[in-house]
Amino acid sequence: MQVKFPAMKLDRRSYEEQAVAVLGPQLFTDRRVLAVAPTGSGKTVMGSMLIANVKRWRRVLWLAHRTELIDQARTRLVNLGVQCGVQCAKYEQLHPEHVDRGAYCQVGSVQTIHRRGSLLDDVDLIVFDEAHRAMADTYQGIATAHPLAEVLGLTATPCRLDGRGLGDFFRVMNVLVKPSQLYGEDYLREPITYIEDEDEVMRGLRGAPTSGGDFTSASMRRAVDKPRLIGNVVRQAQKLAPGVPKVVYAATIEHSKKIASRFRKAGIAAAHLDGDTSAEDRARILDRLRDGTLEVVCNVDVLTEGWDLPALGAVVIARPTKSLSRLMHMIGRVQRAEGPRRKIVIDHGANCTRLQHIPGEDVAWTLEHGEPARPDAEVEPRLKTCIECSAMIRWTSAECPQCGAEQPTAKTRRQILDEQEAELVRLNRARFEKKRNELRKRAEKVAKERGLDMSWVERVVDGEMPRVP
């Protein structure tokens, strides 16, 4: 029997209610549905509303891979009146009062559930939070254990980290809302992006090895862990986003610690955290960032997913990546409408150029192929940097929307190659005509000496006669 707590009223945006109305019937028909919405759009709210409103599900299992996501989902579900228990070894130690094995909805760590089993028989609905991870063995093992369950995937980036699609598991994809719609309604803020150190990082990554679809730690370290580049990370953060809370994404733990140290030497309160940071220290550091006693937190793959600070003013991407999904998740941390009006992204990894991604644009995802095909950045570039302020702007922009500077006429690599080829043809033709004229003069001299007519001269010039002696 479903038991509900007294419900708390939530502000339901129209697209959230539309999503709930569509997803319930779609899950009944297609069984495995991938729901896509931008970071900060309220995917957890939409999933929770769906569970609270659809009555056919007697047993529900919500899976996430981080305690922050588990706590977020549990809170949303309880606020909507859903009886909810938690199954996560680490979370249970911190909040034993939230363990309720009899609750019909269990929010759990994918690792814990995979190890223990869900403690629920005949699960009717499984929710995969951050569903771009759905092809991992842990998620697949849980889905296999409940073959009759409907599966809802929630993600902002419907592809694996290597860019491949999720069509091997999900049967249909539903884009619930697009970034452009949320910017138009001021639910999200489109960030201003600045490109720094692009040429040097690009050179450092030529021929760099990859693993799992992204650069290896060693190749990233060689490209960006340099004193000059680290110093520039600090200088540009001070210049472009002074005084606002910032998160820095570093290449390695050592790289992150060096950046934090350089910030502190510049008189800016900064801290480092990584996967080995204790839960207590991590909470303390993030609380300090939230209350303003800390301005910068440097990290390595910790604050990429499942963490939000609406007051965040800037993200500094001090690492390269080949993964559009990873890049979008880093940028997504700074798109919430709360906090500073100007939201800043500083890209020190040449990522937007490499991936031809304009932060905030709508992406044409597909279920089968994941990331859309991107044009060659050298042949068909989509973006450039302002000649005055270094803000990233569209390739066709004649004026920078940030500083107003007039931009020189941009030429694509293809246009440049065409012009070079045309110039080469012109030069070759000029050389050819010069040689023909020299040959004509010599032939005319010989014809005059030998009493030959001009037809002989033309035949020599056209190559029909032996060379002129």
Each model region followed by its residue ranges:
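Conserved pre-motif I regulatory segment
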Residues: 2-36
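Walker A/P-loop
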Residues: 29-50, 249
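Conserved Walker A/P-loop ATP-binding site and its immediately adjacent core
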Residues: 57-79
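Conserved helicase ATPase core of P-loop NTP-dependent helicases/translocases
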Residues: 91-100, 257-261, 268-300
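A short beta-strand element within the Helicase C-terminal
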Residues: 123-124, 296-299, 305-320, 326, ...
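Conserved interdomain linker/interface between the two RecA-like ATPase lobes of SF2 helicase motors
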Residues: 173-247
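Conserved segment of the helicase C-terminal RecA-like domain
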Residues: 334-360
